[in-house]
Amino acid sequence: HYPLRRQRQMCIRDRAITGPNGCGKSSVLAMLAGRLSAVAGACRVEVPLAYLDQQLSCLPAAQSALEHLRRCNHGLPEALARTRLMHLGLDAHRALLPCARLSGGERLKLALAGVIDSEPASPLLLLDEPDNHIDLDSLLAVEAMLRDYRGALIVVSHDAAFIEALAITDRLQWTAQGWQYERA
């Protein structure tokens, strides 16, 4: 628990939160999402947002990928939902599996599609280590999805190459002196 020592007002643009394990990156993101309260001061986000935590808890374990995508998109016609799932690499069989049975990369792509393709899409997307535990093909697909996202991103990641692939230059970074905001 390390405080942000100065008041910060950040306009919405793409940002990364970086630092070593245990420094509080996920806690900062959870505060922005309204899942944790600040110990001191206040944290306020005044735009609608979507939050994908490391466990992708937004995905109902028993619901199929097809059902989830249709629910997120207010009754998207089944044929269009199946086409979108095929583009994500989920064939007709995998589209009917419960979300809990999908691989990490499949779950992440499905969760992102549910957020990005929803109407209206959230103008702010918070992602907690989306590049963890996924294969290279899924990572490249996630990078492409995020580059096409029209809203602002705040991403927690240890992977400098992933952050660079998303063209994120502004960072809230943990250093030996505490949290530092770096703008490129």
Predicted regions located by residue number:
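The start of beta-strands in P-loop NTPase/AAA+ ATPase cores
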Residues: 8, 48, 123-124
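ABC ATPase nucleotide-binding domain signature region
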Residues: 14, 19-77, 158-161, 165-184
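Helical segment within the ABC ATPase nucleotide-binding domain
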Residues: 139-150
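Conserved H-loop
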Residues: 151-156
